């Protein structure tokens, strides 16, 4: 714990070894920069706002909204990384519940993983969400996976092991355009996070740090949120507009 690693060392090795600190930097970069380096990332990428999120749970404990009694339906968005190097994006699976025009983030998994683990974890994640199907939990309606190299491979390899078909999400538009489409909905409190979830800090920090010039470090969590907004809020509204009768 006292020996430097890659030229770095801990000021308090008896309390926190350099190995522990490097592990924290890897797993929770925003937390590490804020608490240990006294150099928090600027949470203002100019697109999404930290204050745009609402929180659900115990209202007496500070939540903005209660846990809905019944979900209208649920769905999953997934963003897969092609490599597990520390400088590459993460793989993220997110389950969402829909209620009165808002999306609530439910189960959530974020990790760097090789292909075999990706297949196992994704299959387990989807099946666990499917098994909750009931009147109050609502039905799992869709599984959306980004249609790129790693995502396409995942779709082909696990489709037969899942209880419903995967919906590939093509990347027909650039990331900034998709972010700008979702921006107003996030700012309007349409994305609701579970109160006291320890994963919230990294999630909010990453989304709020998303930049127009692609200078942000990661955007895998932002991607799954954008896909969720597009699927459950933007597309239904667009479809409703198209069915309106004009005179």
Language model features by range: what are they?
Residues 2-80:
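ATPase catalytic-site recognition across NTP-hydrolyzing enzymes
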Residues 4, 10, 106-109, 114-116, ...:
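Conserved inter-motif catalytic segment of the P-loop NTP-binding fold
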Residues 34-39, 84-87, 94, 131-138, ...:
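C-terminal nuclease/phosphodiesterase catalytic domains that cleave nucleic-acid phosphodiester bonds
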Residues 63-69, 83-87, 124-128, 134-136:
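Short, conserved, surface-exposed binding loops centered on an aromatic residue
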Residues 67-98, 224:
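Gly/Thr-rich phosphate-binding beta-strand-loop-beta motif of the actin/hexokinase/Hsp70
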Residues 78, 145-148:
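Short His-Asn-centered micro-motif
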Residues 81-83, 98-101, 110-111, 150, ...:
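Short, glycine-/Ser/Thr-/acidic-enriched flexible segments
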Residues 94-145:
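Nucleic-acid-processing active sites and adjacent nucleic-acid-binding tracks
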